[in-house]
């Protein structure tokens, strides 16, 4: 879990546009966040396996 201070800091508008970054909405992780779902890869995988993300299913070929 991310520190509450880092989550609060990220919500503020940055002084420069390039300083903005994405965080997982579920756990607050700053790395490997899918923009479309606003989830990190770990949370995405957990929710996809449970079937809680509509339209996502395990690939097989």
Swiss-Prot record:
Textual note on the cofactor: Binds 1 zinc ion per subunit.
GO biological process: translation
Entry cofactors: Zn(2+)
A Pfam family it matches: Ribosomal_S14
Domain of life (superkingdom): Bacteria
GO terms assigned for molecular function: rRNA binding; structural constituent of ribosome; zinc ion binding
Keywords, in A-Z order: Metal-binding, Ribonucleoprotein, Ribosomal protein, RNA-binding, rRNA-binding, Zinc
GO cellular component: small ribosomal subunit
Keyword Transit peptide among record annotations: no
Chain positions recorded as Zn(2+) binding sites: 24, 27, 40, 43
UniProt keyword annotation of Isomerase present: no
Residues annotated as signal peptide: none
Function per UniProt: Binds 16S rRNA, required for the assembly of 30S particles and may also be responsible for determining the conformation of the 16S rRNA at the A site.
HAMAP family: Ribosomal_uS14_2_B
Subunit structure: Part of the 30S ribosomal subunit. Contacts proteins S3 and S10.
Homology family: Belongs to the universal ribosomal protein uS14 family. Zinc-binding uS14 subfamily.
Protein name: Small ribosomal subunit protein uS14
Organism: Anoxybacillus flavithermus (strain DSM 21510 / WK1)
